[in-house]
Each structure stands twice: as C-alpha cells, then as structure tokens.
Amino acid sequence: MQQPQAATATDTDTFAQGHAAPMEYLRQILTARVYDIARETELDPALGLSRRLGNRVSFKREDNQPVFSFKVRGAYNKMRNTPQAALDRGVITASAGNHAQGVAISAAKLGVRATIVVPQTAPQVKVDAVRAHGGPTVQVVLAGDSYSDAYAHAQTLAAEQNLTFIPAFDDPYVIAGQGTVLSLIHISEPTRRRGIS
C-alpha cells in the first residue's frame, strides 16, 4: 500500500474545522498515532455465527483495549492533535463511561490535567475506572442525571476555566482515531470485505 502524503497546514486546518474531503479523512486515519496507547486488536472468527448466517463473520476485539473499548482511539487522537498550549491549560469532557476512560488514560499518558464530567447516574464501576486510568492528573465531577446534563456542565466549566473540550463524537480527529479500527480490518482481511458494521 502506498503511504499517504503528509498533510499541509491548510489541509490540517480544513480538517480540524470539520470540512474535509473523504481522502483527507483517509489520510488522517492512516497517519493517526493511536498506537502509543491503543493495541492492535485481534480479528477473531465467529464460527457459530458464520455457520448460522452462511457468511464469514469476525469480531474485532476492541474489548481487549486498555479501557475495553475503541473509544480510546478517538480520545487519544484528538488529544495528540490538540495544540500543546491548549493541553497545558487542561482538557475537559463529558461522558457516561467509555469515552471518559479514553480521555482519562490519554491524559495520564500525555501528562495533561483533565476534568471528566459524568452524570450522577453513571455506574460506579465506570467512575472508578475513570479514576484508575487517569490517576492524579484526572478529576471526576458528577453532574446531572443524564449525558445532556453532564455535557452542559462540562461546557460551563470549559468556558469558566479556559479548558479544552474533548468531544466524544462529531469531531474529525475523534472520527479519524476511531477509524483506525477499520484500517486494521482492511490490513487483516484485504480480500474478504463485503460488509462491516
């Protein structure tokens, strides 16, 4: 496979603003540096399901990531592509679980102070996991009864404390980081792709 050309400053600016062409997304996926923290996970055959459906079915084992979810890929890629000055001020996110853990472990890896806002209704096991993955660099704030409440509180804190918000979705760098899962499937199974979900 031919290596993608490096992005120019203009390409990167356009990408960061969410106005990128599909080929720029592909370039960002192929050059994402998520493997500083994420694992290259297995693609395991699902033999029983394959027999039942009459097709070859495999499972991408993202449950083998350090936070048991693909969400670490997007969180880390976003933080790796955030200017150092913004990271130095600290980051904040809102999440009920997997993205929160991804930001926490990424903050610990990068030595960044992070505030993680989770709903008060989040399972205690998720809150404990966020604290464990983040260690002393992470502060967990419980706010509201829903993700929407936690998100609103995180936005308020971000504005008041000049923190950089790390979104869980709808961000080009988060999407590209999470897209690295697909690039691994492509490498693992180059000739047998009919449907991916």
What are these regions (language model features)?
Residues 1-188, 192:
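PLP-dependent amino-acid enzyme catalytic core
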